[in-house]
Amino acid sequence: MTLRHALFISLVFISTACFGAETKKSSPEDFIRALYRFHQPGKDTPDWFADKQTLSKYFDKELTALFIKNYECEKREQGVGNLDFDPIYDAQDFEKETTNLRIAPAPDEPDLFNVTFTNLGTRTLVYRLTNTPSGWRISDIKYPEELSPKGNIVT
């Protein structure tokens, strides 16, 4: 085996270990941080709540299907669906920056995480996560004054 082959094989193993660990072995807190890095509605980012492939990277099968159902309703009703706010921010309006993101496990609830952030005020949402073979996925989000996405879309 030449030095080139050994170096190439080493790089493949290191890359696989690094990239695979981030997506499948990340902590729940890292998973939620990645969601907020990806989804920044105050900036010019595309609306991904109609893209099943992207949704399934962050949400479980049931919630993904409900977001797709809501999108289909919006198309039928010309923009009016059951979910009239951004479910990640519990808001309709946004600043360009989200600050003070804090994620903490809920006491005595291993699948619940309190997510606090500042964007046009400070909010705390409660995420229910499920550890799937593909990594962490959001199975629900509880808002201080409203139903969860499941409750809003189903009703």
What is the meaning of each model-derived region?
Residues 43-52:
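Surface-exposed patches in mature extracellular/periplasmic domains of secreted proteins
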Residues 27-31, 51, 153:
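Stable alpha-helical elements in mature extracytoplasmic
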Residues 26-44:
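Short, aromatic-enriched amphipathic alpha-helices that serve as compact interaction elements
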Residues 23, 59-121:
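Surface-exposed, charged secondary-structure patches
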Residues 69, 73, 106-112, 116-126, ...:
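Low-complexity, intrinsically disordered terminal/linker segments enriched in charged
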Residues 1-7:
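Bacterial N-terminal signal peptides that target proteins for export
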Residues 15-16:
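N-terminal signal peptide c-region/cleavage motif recognized by signal peptidases
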